[in-house]
Amino acid sequence: EFGEYDLIISATGNHNVNRWINQYVMSNKLMVPVVYAWNEVLGLGNHVAYIEYGNAGCYECFIGRDEDTGELYDRTAYCRSGQKVVQKVTGCGSSFIPYGSTISLKTAGMCVDTIKKIFEGRYSDNVIISAKGDDYHFKRSGLQVSNKYLNQKDSIVECSGKLFAQPKCQFCGEKYGN
């Protein structure tokens, strides 16, 4: 049972798993901090989010729906939505999404730092920390960055849940008068 833990960490990078965890925690009103950590493709960046029931904003607030196509997309992504980023390995018979080891180390470090701040009581709100990476390999692969990447001036930004909360979020929107 998730409610028995002091902290939940999801470092799968899988939005479906993260959305399920968020839905479970929010629906059951579990007062357990959850840390989500994920990489962007080809070292383009990384994110760590601290979400706790009772604070503004939740993981579902990171997910948007394209008005034209109806497809879901990640509002936090540095990679422009609608692109195919899967690569195939010849002879391997499988596809994968390319991530670098360096970005994974940065994500792990940000995650540990976030957890330390949680247990020191340094966060009073939910938060997402986003770090821009190098776009060299990304652009050489013919991919395009998102407006979020282009508009983010600082290499690392921290955004409060009060700013990323979505008014019509099915899990946290109504409790904040939205």
Predicted segment positions?
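Glycine-rich phosphate/adenylate-binding loop
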Residues: 3-7, 11-178
